[in-house]
Amino acid sequence: MRYSTQQDVLDFVEDNNVKFVRFAFCDIFGTQKNIAVLASDLPKALEDGVCFDGSSIAGFMKVEESDLVLRPDLPTVTILPWRPTEGRVMQFFCDVEKPDGDPFGGNCRGFLREMNRRFRKLGLTCNVGAECEFYLFENDDRGRPTRVPIDFGGYFDVAPLDAGENLRRDICLTMEQMGMSPQHSHHESGNGQNEIDCHYAGPLKTADNVMMFKQIVRAVAMRSGIHASFLPKPLADQAGSGLHINLSLYMDGRNLFEGDIAPDSIAGSFMAGVLAHSRALTVFTNPLPNSYLRFGSDEAPKYVSWSRQNRSQLVRIPQVQGDNCRMELRSPDPACNPYLAIGLILAAGLDGIERRLELQAPINKNLFDPAVAAGLGLEKLPSTLEEAVQAAQESDFLRTVLPEELSHRYYEEELKRCAALKNAADPAEYERIHYFNAI
């Protein structure tokens, strides 16, 4: 059932013995936040929204103008099945607005919604899928995370090398309970590394799914005494974790990525736009200092290029048929804000379409081989977070698509991250506390 009215939601609360309601949102970096109300106060919260102090959320508001309001997106209502069945807990994803009802520039869900609306205005339907990788680590005898992976398995391994199969099953079943559609789950190439993919959906639904997926993984892992980490590169000698973003475009019921892609076609121009702005987007798709340790190895790209099938490329076109035809962007990682990341990828593609950019020839070479890559003269992705911030600040494109207030605060906070890590007495310990334990 689609819950589209306040009465639908109130009936759902009564039918499901809900006693506690979470209003969930995220800051501009993709860190999930929430405020909860008792079910008895829900009618007023639905009518008036829930006020909160925006100055206490990183990148949101100044102290002197701090009030913001959460407005729940009613169709996103869901029960949290890992919470008690007596006095259940349910959750909405929310949009953030100003007290007078005006849009708030830091409302990243709203930014993604607007990008999707612009595609629809052109007669284009965009579907997005996400492939999310993560690590599972043992906790010590005091329940604190360690960097000891739960197994020493590799790609597609099974028990006894794979110790995460039962946990992945529990995650997938929980996803189904919450209205999500898991597609594939398997052990990844790193020790203790796993991947679960979701079926494609609209851009906003997929971004919501990424946020919910991370919440589910952490909850199910914690219940089993295991620490789940979405840090892009938690182990120096193992593969990094990516959040590969798959996109397809439809016009008049036809998948524009199916078959040959002409350089000046809509699909070709979309890809050309993504490639043209990929350096500027990197600070949003890869937001941590740790993110840049992943690039250039273990199927994580380093150069701005595309190809078919080739996993050393930034963008690849998988060799599939029908509705599965798509482009895959391989640089994003799970630490990103999915609303901003997907929204900006769409904006870059749209810029390519509107400017009729032509897709350059594919690079059908193994770019993980330094000797091969060195001779091609390809543009590189930023190699550090500081370089990524600079690339974004120099981008005329980003100045036109992002609210100035949001971009300024985002860059400012990112540079603070860089400085804090550099100035830490023990950078490894700083990363453990602030990123490994939290991302």
Please give the residue ranges for each predicted region:
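Glycine-rich, acidic/polar active-site loops that bind/position phosphate-bearing ligands
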Residues: 1-439
